[in-house]
Curated annotation (Swiss-Prot):
Keyword Membrane: no
Gene field: trpF
EC number of this enzyme: 5.3.1.24
Keyword Amino-acid biosynthesis applies: yes
Coiled coil start-end: none
Pathway, per record: Amino-acid biosynthesis; L-tryptophan biosynthesis; L-tryptophan from chorismate: step 3/5
Reaction equations catalysed: N-(5-phospho-beta-D-ribosyl)anthranilate = 1-(2-carboxyphenylamino)-1-deoxy-D-ribulose 5-phosphate
Organism expressing this protein natively: Thermotoga petrophila (strain ATCC BAA-488 / DSM 13995 / JCM 10881 / RKU-1)
UniProt cross-references to Pfam families, sorted A to Z: PRAI
Name the record gives this protein: N-(5'-phosphoribosyl)anthranilate isomerase
MF terms in GO: phosphoribosylanthranilate isomerase activity
SUPFAM superfamilies to which the protein is assigned, alphabetical: Ribulose-phoshate binding barrel
Length: 205
């Protein structure tokens, strides 16, 4: 069964509802320019209230390794999602301490080939935008298909919502799906009906 990550969590109510609805992971965005930014202090207050076996993921964009690891330890993260232009050497350095998920923006086949350079890590494919994710826009999922089996753990993101997630999963066969804007009432606040429907459709329940 595909795993589901609800990203852009900014409050405890949304985090707990996501988990109770069947989310496998929640994501905190530590990129200050994001509309869904959360401070490490607020993220920690949410993290410590979550039940065990829920994956806590921190999203960073072109951040210093020491800062990433400090925040990861403080917030009690299980993984970090590197959503910028991080070179593979930096990813490997951080991966010595915590699980790394490398996000790559996709707009054409060359981007898929670039993503393959990171396939030693779980790779998240997102729609390429200047804002580094959270755009609500999809990319052409068929670009993935010739390369699908070269990714060990593929996470699909970018414009997913309750209406299209099932067809995306059926086409791409990802290990996990990641959603943020597709289940929002507005940036930073989730729509609970959308979360419930998204998870139900993703998991085929």
């Amino acid at each position: 069964m595909v795993r589901v990550k609800i990203c852009g969590i900014t409050n405890l109510e949304d985090a707990l509802f996501s988990v109770e609805s069947g989310a496998d992971a929640v994501g905190f965005v530590f990129y200050p320019k994001s509309k869904r930014y959360i401070s490490p202090e607020d993220a920690r207050r949410i993290s410590v209230e979550l039940p065990p076996f829920v994956f806590r993921v921190g999203v960073f964009v072109n951040e210093e390794p020491e800062k990433i690891l400090d925040v990861a330890s403080y917030v009690q993260l299980n993984a970090v999602q590197l959503h910028g232009e991080e070179p593979i050497e930096l990813c490997r350095k951080i991966a010595e301490r915590i699980l790394v998920i490398k996000a790559v923006g996709i707009s054409n086949e060359r981007d898929i080939e670039r993503a393959l350079n990171y396939r030693e890590f779980p790779v998240l494919l997102d729609t390429k935008t200047p804002e580094y994710g959270g755009s609500g826009k999809t990319f052409d999922w068929s670009l993935i298909l010739p390369y699908r089996d070269q990714f060990r753990y593929l996470v699909l993101s970018g414009g997913l919502n309750p209406d299209n997630v099932r067809s995306a999963i059926d086409m791409v066969r990802p290990f996990a799906v990641d959603v943020s804007s597709g289940v929002e009432a507005f940036p930073g606040k989730k729509d609970h009906d959308s979360i419930k429907t998204f998870i139900k459709n993703a998991k085929g329940l």
